[in-house]
Amino acid sequence: MQEQKLQENDFSTLQTFKRLWPMIKPFKAGLIVSGVALVFNALADSGLIYLLKPLLDDGFGKANHSFLKMMAFVVVGMIILRGITNFISNYCLAWVSGKVVMTMRRRLFKHLMFMPVSFFDQNSTGRLLSRITYDSQMIASSSSGSLITIVREGAYIISLFAVMFYTSWELTIVLFIIGPIIAVLIRLVSKIFRRLSKNLQDSMGELTSATEQMLKGHKVVLSFGGQHVEEVHFNHVSNDMRRKSMKMVTANSISDPVVQVIASLALATVLYLATTPLIAEDNLSAGSFTVVFSSMLAMMRPLKSLTAVNAQFQSGMAACQTLFAILDLEPEKDDGAYKAEPAKGELEFKNVSFAYQGKDELALNNISFSVPAGKTVALVGRSGSGKSTIANLVTRFYDIEQGEILLDGVNIQDYRLSNLRENCAVVSQQVHLFNDTIANNIAYAAQDKYSREEIIAAAKAAYALEFIEKLPQVFDTVIGENGTSLSGGQRQRLAIARALLRNSPVLILDEATSALDTESERAIQSALEELKKDRTVVVIAHRLSTIENADEILVIDHGEIRERGNHKTLLEQNGAYKQLHSMQFTG
């Protein structure tokens, strides 16, 4: 069985960006427009600096007032150009990043929906929520914010180099010596940022998981006075995240001054060389020197920005790696092509053995039984004996590696997954309802397939109509997340109505009434009997009174069938079933 834990591959920044590029490519028009705007923005900035030479040498140096008046309009025009191009570049890149993040989230969401149950057994909900929300948003930093900075500041530095080289190539050569040193420094810092960013994202997942755990289990926390335990746990993970965040800040804060010091050394060198006779006598005017010196001063800002954006870009790339690690995992195997519309419902287990991932002990050991179409088999036994595992295998929530499970004589692995699950309806102890209307919950995933009359008929058969009609908007009432506004019995009846509407030939009742009180159980027992009619039923029961009429009862213990027969014959055997029966009915 394939391991489904998240393991991030150590790809380089370039390799990761190459994988991200297919998501960016459909929106490359926005990148091109933004790139052109950023180039013009950089030219406007460097052009303003270059204007210092004619202003000083020709305007003020020669007292040319008409020239100075003309230059005033030129400066205003360049500043307007700078503002327009800045807006265009920011808007286009924000549009691109929004599209990329949306695409990634949609791919991730769709991929997660097709992952096997074993994947969710091994990865916490909080961590996965963090991946979809926090990590996917981090991609915006690498596809928008950081790209704006990289392109704009990169173009600005190149244009400043061009201005300096055109004005005085001798002084500009100094920067060609210092440049590679800064590049090497940025490369070294990139690796540090990448590692720290991965650690920070892991901490965010743990923080989300801790929060989600407390919110979902809030009643348990209150009941057992676990506030201190949860507070200590949350304080630990939040402090761990704070420490990792401070490491990022420290690395960023150290890298900036180092780059600034190296750049200032280049500036001081230029200032010193300008005083030497070789350059001073080479027609270096006040305007030319001012342009070179101002260009070098102006270059400090983009150099600092490029160093700072490196941390942002590496965070985005680390987030991409994490998300690609999920997308690289294989979804549920769905190699079958057989379709039964509908199946007759004959179910058979042949020598089935199964173990959960990461466990050596078998959950099921050589299980064999058959259920003729339209008959009911009940599974009873202690908690952890393997009853629910059998139910999960019928719907292929887990795949077996030994034995066969047949539906109408066909191996369930030969069925198309969608068709297999269309032929099986599950009503479990843990009912999940969606934050939607009553009608949409009953007709979940098939709202267009069923009419309102069919939905009402299913609700009536499930004995749910009596409470639905009392709701403010009746079937159009939104019931809140997981049906929080409903009682346990009401939620269970909606689950039964959902199964009735689906009308599948195979029905699995996984302790469907064990969480209810006796009165609620009695209220829905008639609904369950209606649901069982003309169906092959697998019942997992805690209360033996609910399965006395089953055609066959299997007593499961430690993953094996210990006893089998109907209620009467099992009582006569005076074995494990008789012992369970005596415990429930005689105390």
Curated annotation (Swiss-Prot):
Coiled coil: none
BP-aspect Gene Ontology terms: transmembrane transport
CDD domains listed in its UniProt record: ABC_6TM_MsbA_like
Major location category of this protein: membrane
Keyword flag Cell inner membrane: yes
PROSITE patterns listed in its UniProt record: ABC_TM1F (PS50929), ABC_TRANSPORTER_1 (PS00211), ABC_TRANSPORTER_2 (PS50893), MSBA (PS51239)
The UniProt record lists the keyword Cytoplasm: no
Subcellular locations according to the entry: Cell inner membrane
Family, similarity comment: Belongs to the ABC transporter superfamily. Lipid exporter (TC 3.A.1.106) family.
Protein name (Swiss-Prot/TrEMBL): ATP-dependent lipid A-core flippase
Species, as recorded: Haemophilus influenzae (strain ATCC 51907 / DSM 11121 / KW20 / Rd)
